[in-house]
């Protein structure tokens, strides 16, 4: 639970995402004071702030990827789900340096 409610958040990670792969970022928030079971809140797909730069398989370059959601209802609980997928089992996406920032 957040100490201060927020209506904005940013997700950033360094990604190594081959051409055959993709990373999907989902989030869900709970409004301030909500008594709704958090597990019953639906996940929302977040779009990256700009096109994700993909790398050639075997390239160890990591590139920063940002997601921002603004103008949300005030929330004090947030969950993030990252789905990494690929059509080639030898070209899998990798992420590191994950940061999730909720701003008051």
Labelled PLM ranges:
Residues 1-104:
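Beta-strand-rich ligand- or partner-binding modules
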